[in-house]
């Protein structure tokens, strides 16, 4: 072999090695961005008419913070502020429906998105030594505290949104909006007891739900003036795609949380490949199809199995991919503060 050919082959081999090394270093966040993050900074819900919402934006901020991606963080935050921030309320409009003439006709907020954004901004301020992020998060927290945490039946309650959930005789609650690592994080940051009390009451609510054949958390619950907690009649009585985040957040804060016991018992009734996607907690009727990838990762987390960094396929829509990412961060107890 001539020296020239040997040199050429060596260069080719080196380039192949570099290419393979770069591919190996790609993270789940890199793949997630490619699949669900637009060039402008919106997270696209591929399973819901390609809308964007504060849930997705907050997840995008969280993931970019975890992977130390300041460029994506800034892009996502700028899009969220430009398109979803409600100056009058000081909160974020819950959804951007790009297929409609007015993408933000519904001005209501979704409190889980606001809470996650506030927490992540505060954590970003710490990690990247950016006081503007911290102040922005604290300002949003203040609005949440003053408008979305109410006392009802002598207990603090987190409203799912400003509009439609609080009535004279009852309040409707989404248990998955109690993001326990976030509540713990902001409690440690602010030293305000209200956040710890809210977290504690959230756990009491999910264990107090009456009239259930299946004792896991439903997607929506109702608290009445007498302090009775029951499955909301405004939605199907299911534990499904919302409620699956409850054990995820419980584990994230404390993998030994006693509230996980019923979830472990439920999951252990099925093999991983035959666990139903949802169950009606009143009737016991189960879905006729099984859990998809994101839900299965939550199951794996709760059952004490190792959770690896996710690898996505074309079958994974936005929500399944997001659940898988959240589960990985929960397994790592990312940003947790004991």
What are these regions (language model features)?
Residues 61-66, 116-126, 181-185, 248-252, ...:
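Short glycine/serine- and small hydrophobic-enriched flexible loop segments
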Residues 68-71, 84, 125-128, 144, ...:
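A generic secondary-structure signal for well-formed alpha-helical elements
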Residues 108-145:
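A generic, well-ordered mixed alpha/beta core segment in the N-terminal half of proteins
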Residues 22-26:
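Sec/Tat signal peptide C-region and signal peptidase I cleavage site
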Residues 10-21:
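Bacterial N-terminal signal peptides
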Residues 2-11:
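Bacterial N-terminal signal peptides that target proteins for export
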Residues 27, 50-54, 112, 135-307, ...:
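Extended ligand-binding clefts on enzyme/binding-domain cores
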Residues 28-114, 312:
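N-terminal carbohydrate-binding/catalytic regions of secreted carbohydrate-active enzymes
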């Amino acid at each position: 072999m001539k020296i020239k050919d040997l040199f050429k082959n060596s260069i080719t081999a080196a380039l192949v090695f570099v290419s393979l090394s770069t591919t190996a270093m790609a993270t789940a966040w890199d793949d997630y961005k490619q699949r669900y993050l637009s060039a402008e900074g919106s997270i696209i819900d591929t399973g819901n008419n390609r809308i964007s919402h504060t849930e997705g934006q907050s997840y995008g901020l969280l993931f970019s913070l975890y992977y130390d991606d300041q460029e994506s963080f800034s892009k996502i935050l700028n899009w969220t502020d430009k398109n979803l921030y409600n100056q009058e309320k000081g909160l974020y409009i819950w959804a951007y429906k790009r297929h409609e003439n007015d993408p933000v006709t519904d001005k209501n907020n979704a409190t889980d998105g606001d809470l996650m954004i506030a927490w992540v901004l505060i954590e970003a301020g710490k990690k990247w030594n950016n006081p503007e992020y911290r102040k922005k998060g604290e300002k949003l927290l203040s609005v949440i505290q003053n408008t979305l945490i109410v006392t009802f039946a002598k207990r603090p309650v987190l409203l799912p949104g400003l509009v439609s959930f609080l009535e004279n005789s009852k309040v409707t609650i989404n248990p998955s909006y109690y993001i326990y690592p976030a509540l713990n994080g902001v409690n440690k940051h602010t030293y305000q007891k209200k956040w710890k009390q809210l977290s504690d009451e959230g756990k009491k609510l999910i264990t107090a739900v009456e009239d259930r054949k299946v004792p896991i958390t439903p997607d929506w619950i109702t608290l009445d003036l007498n302090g009775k907690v029951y499955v909301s009649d405004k939605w199907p009585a299911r534990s499904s795609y919302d409620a699956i985040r409850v054990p995820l957040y419980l584990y994230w804060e404390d993998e030994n949380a006693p509230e996980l016991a019923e979830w472990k018992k439920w999951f252990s009734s099925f093999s991983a490949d035959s666990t139903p996607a949802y169950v009606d907690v009143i009737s016991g009727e189960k879905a006729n199809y099984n859990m998809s990838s994101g839900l299965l990762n939550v199951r794996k987390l709760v059952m004490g199995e190792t959770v690896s960094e996710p690898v996505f396929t074309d079958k994974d829509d936005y929500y399944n991919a997001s659940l898988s990412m959240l589960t990985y961060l929960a397994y790592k107890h990312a940003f947790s503060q004991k």
